[in-house]
Amino acid sequence: MSTLKIDDQNEIYYEYVEPKGDGHTFVFVNALTGSTAAWNGVIGNRITEDGNGFLAYNFRGQDNSKFNEELNLDTDLIVSDLCLLIEKLKFKNIILVGLSIGGLYASLALEKGVKSNGLVLINTLRKNNSRLKWINETMVNVARYGGTSLLMDMNMPVIASPSFLDKMKPNALNTVSYTHIRAHETVMNRGWRLLR
């Protein structure tokens, strides 16, 4: 567990397992609601059993990755961070693996010059349409208002099994973790006091 420091307000959290010999490094690119936890366990263990390694990392704004709140966490920034991470850690013999929109980010990293021996797309949509644009814009708005915790809580019933939801419930649906809402309430409360 490490971080790549970009500056005093920005850093990228990552977990790296080195491959053996000529093994590949699988670079896992999260979904918007993802985290390194999605890749550890079954997936990570299976890859390392074959002598390969992996890099799992969190985008700025996801768990343990700090970011300047004035930054626009958009596609260009996320793809640039992926390229920077691969360059700084000097990975060779990589295979990019993108989950959901992470597949788009991995594809765009290839367009920016990242050298990869393969590209694996998991649940990545091929065509943008009105429905997908609506969902993506809503997800961004939810993240802006309540942070990634609220975004995760909104999406879990759609992407997880009922038994998994039951296991997650004690650590989910906790409004204390909706950071942006608290900041908004603080500003609103201060504003109302000024009007009294």
Where are the predicted features?
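Flexible "cap/lid" loop of the alpha/beta hydrolase fold
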Residues: 107-111, 117-146
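Active-site loop/oxyanion-hole signature of alpha/beta-hydrolase fold enzymes
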Residues: 53-97
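Helix-loop "lid/cap" segments that line or gate small-molecule binding pockets
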Residues: 142, 153-166, 177-178
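N-terminal cap/lid segment of alpha/beta-hydrolase-fold proteins
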Residues: 1-11
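Conserved HGGG/HGGXW glycine-rich cap/lid loop of the alpha/beta-hydrolase fold
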Residues: 10-67
